[in-house]
């Protein structure tokens, strides 16, 4: 199927993918006077008297803003807010179709972190949560961290944490397949940008102790003096053996390779230098860091990619619909590390011992159990950590 042609036809014929659907009928004078003036003034008065009643009388409790400035859209780069709108519409569709969460795409003409922060704070009263999307690094770090501190609704940068949660879920099961433990394995991550950094943080939360991050200049280590602040931080908290060099040196004896970088950077020969029963997650799209057959030829036992035409697809849609559903259901103030880890285990545990195998470490995108399992786990973790208001 020619997906490019099909996508153009879909978007043109429907004039986009989302619209507004009224929940109430306005067919009589009484309907009009109830839905709008004068009747509408009464819920306004109630909310004025008790601002929390906005959740009772409006759509806020199940409505997420999908916010982007279009500076890092898919593999297209900085294409601007207008060109990024089809992606944000798509995100809204997935939130609704998979999680039952209403969402509205908002593409803003704002490049600096300060402008994006100001825009999100200005619209926050309308929404129960904010999904940040396709905002370039390093600005995305400051934007998310600031909004998390200053807003009382959950803010979630899916490019970072959605990827990290699903990778963690997949690795939990991959390690179960090969009989290794998170705290014992040597992990190499290639590409410590927004997603890569979040993956490292998530794996550390899950118990990983030996992670080496590798960028285009080589391994990150204490005193590596990177021009990017988050990489200097990674150099301080990872690479306990202070391995220096490039990907070749980092991979010697490694148990796990995680790539969020560029096509073809991992070779069969490099895979052969890894530990027995190696695990490779090659998630560059559309062409991964190494193709599955090449990795298997190098002795890799468990392989995952971001593609739907290979086994073990690492797909964010397994995470964000259920995560927002769960967070909104308890009116969470935040999405914290414990909620993210709960989501990862909820996804992983859907694959039973009997079903788990080298080519089945993560549920499929259309598994109907996923969103509710994630929502339940996230809601409980929110209660356990004191960020739930219900």
What are these regions (language model features)?
Residues 158-159, 178, 282-390:
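Adenosine-phosphate binding glycine-rich loop
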Residues 69-71, 79, 108-109, 134-137, ...:
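Short, ordered loop/turn segments at secondary-structure junctions
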Residues 55-60, 96-97, 122-124, 148-149, ...:
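Solvent-exposed alpha-helices and their adjacent loops that cap or buttress functional pockets
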